[in-house]
Amino acid sequence: MTQAATRPTNDAGQDGGNNSDILVVARQQVLQRGEGLNQDQVLAVLQLPDDRLEELLALAHEVRMRWCGPEVEVEGIISLKTGGCPEDCHFCSQSGLFASPVRSAWLDIPSLVEAAKQTAKSGATEFCIVAAVRGPDERLMAQVAAGIEAIRNEVEINIACSLGMLTAEQVDQLAARGVHRYNHNLETARSFFANVVTTHTWEERWQTLSMVRDAGMEVCCGGILGMGETLQQRAEFAAELAELGPDEVPLNFLNPRPGTPFADLEVMPVGDALKAVAAFRLALPRTMLRFAGGREITLGDLGAKRGILGGINAVIVGNYLTTLGRPAEADLELLDELQMPLKALNASL
């Protein structure tokens, strides 16, 4: 886990006066000093008028280039266990509590290895094994262990896992098997979490992340934007992530799934999504910020390009867990067009 972002000592939303322009403040504080914006300052960014969006994106890109460099990390993900989850995350079609078309299924080890091979061929350095569970039982841990061993024997790629909430023993087991990074999203601001999930708490997720950090694995933690949270809660979420100090923050945008409680929510407006991308970059200047699920329906091709030029420095290629993504070739062509080099495997170890 990266060191928690340096926070400004001035708690004023505009860092030194009500008449200060937030982008001028951000240029001095974030770009020049590498200090992330605080919660009030992030809110001021999110509240900027649309006619300042391009200026905001340009600044976020400068911050990304200065504090993270030009390289882009590419990752692929695969679902080892799909569907049948006992939790009630309102955005998720894999919950067994909703009338969703997704049914429970397991992936066999040869298919897992083949997926890892295809991911590596795309230029990705990270392959994440995901399971739709509250937390892994003995069967799942054994399957994950077998999968990790099989992949290591045939594919040169970093292995990440996303298996829900863990016990201390399970954390140690994954670390001992060389898991490079563990993903467990907080999903949204603490104050909004009960509107999204009722079968477990925000604090339970935080506890898993703390154990992962203490075990020496990299921490991947982000969430989903556009689930009905206010701008104030969006800013709160950015500040909470900055306090956590993860190595990677995946930004998802709600793609309303049939049969879920959020099925009828509207897709997040493009301008709001891009402002959020830039705002999270200004809150987390040194953190890997990854485009994840929902960007296709929310941003489209042009929006994705603007996001990569507005603070993003990592992408998931190919399909997601239950929804289609962009073809890997399309993302790689875009990165080549933008002259963004891919992060090499040896640089990510």
From Swiss-Prot:
Q: Which GO terms describe its cellular component?
A: peptidoglycan-based cell wall; plasma membrane
Q: Which UniProt keywords apply?
A: 2Fe-2S, 4Fe-4S, Acetylation, Biotin biosynthesis, Iron, Iron-sulfur, Metal-binding, S-adenosyl-L-methionine, Transferase
> Would the keyword Lipoprotein be found if you checked this record's keyword annotation?
no
Per the entry, the cofactor note is: Binds 1 [4Fe-4S] cluster. The cluster is coordinated with 3 cysteines and an exchangeable S-adenosyl-L-methionine.
Which amino acids does the record list as binding [2Fe-2S] cluster? 128, 161, 220, 290
Alphabetical list of Pfam families matching this protein: BATS, Radical_SAM
The question of whether Cytoplasm is a record keyword is answered with: no
* Necessary cofactors: [4Fe-4S] cluster; [2Fe-2S] cluster
Could you tell me which residues carry N-acetylthreonine? 2
Q: Extract the HAMAP family matched here.
A: BioB
- Function according to Swiss-Prot or TrEMBL: Catalyzes the conversion of dethiobiotin (DTB) to biotin by the insertion of a sulfur atom into dethiobiotin via a radical-based mechanism.
Q: Would you identify the family this protein belongs to, as annotated?
A: Belongs to the radical SAM superfamily. Biotin synthase family.
Q: What is this protein called?
A: Biotin synthase
**Organism the protein comes from:** Mycobacterium tuberculosis (strain ATCC 25618 / H37Rv)
Q: Which gene encodes it?
A: bioB
